[in-house]
Amino acid sequence: MNKIPHEERAKVYAMALDKFGAGTQMVVAIEEMSEVQKEICKAIRGDVNLQHLAEEVADATIMLEQIRLMFGINGEVCAVMDAKVERLRQKIEQS
C-alpha cells in the first residue's frame, strides 16, 4: 500500500466534511474513540487483537485529524502537544 501524503489526506478530510457535514463527522469521531477505548479494555483483560487495535487507532486518528481541520486548530494542537511532551519529559526526569 502506498503512503498517502499529508496534503492528499487533508484534501480527503475536507471532502468528507463537505459531503457528510461537521455534525455527522463529530459524532463519528466520538464513536471511533469509543471503539479504541473498547479495544484497550479488551487488551487489559488479556484479549488483545493487535490488528483490531491498530484499525481502531487509525480510524480515531483520521477522525481527530478531521476535527483539527474542522476547527482550524492544527497549529494550536501541535503547540500544545509539544508543551505536553516536554512536561512529560520533565516528569520522567524528576521521578
Each language-model region and where it sits:
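Flexible "arm" and connector segments at domain edges
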Residues: 1-95
